Amino acid sequence: MKIRPLHDRVIVKRMEEERKTASGIVIPDTAAEKPDQGEIVAVGAGKKDDQGKLISLDVKVGDRVLFGKYAGQTVKVEGEELLVMREEDIMGVVEQ
């Protein structure tokens, strides 16, 4: 199954966080915080302005982005957890 986001929405795959502290203590899943970074795997066509003109998104597939801890809606596709969120929920793009 494949998801195609509509309008100004994007599909984001969360980045895996390190499950071990610097001193070697393993953090259990129940105590670990959700990662606030992810990679964009799909983008919508864009948002229409008041005149009906399509405004394209500033992010693209493959961008590594920062977002709020509780941003977006979690969906499960083929056993993989993905986030569906609006472009405005993205705080920035991580430059590499």
From Swiss-Prot:
Offer one Pfam family short name for this entry: Cpn10
Q: What is its main location?
A: cytoplasm
What does the UniProt entry say about where the protein is found?
A: Cytoplasm
> Entry's NCBIfam families?
PRK00364.1-2, PRK00364.1-5, PRK00364.2-2, PRK00364.2-4, PRK00364.2-5
Which family does this protein fall into?
A: Belongs to the GroES chaperonin family.
Subunit description: Heptamer of 7 subunits arranged in a ring. Interacts with the chaperonin GroEL.
**Which PANTHER family does the UniProt record give?**
10 KDA HEAT SHOCK PROTEIN, CO-CHAPERONIN GROES
HAMAP family according to UniProt? CH10
What is this protein called in UniProt? Co-chaperonin GroES
What is the name of the gene encoding this protein? groES
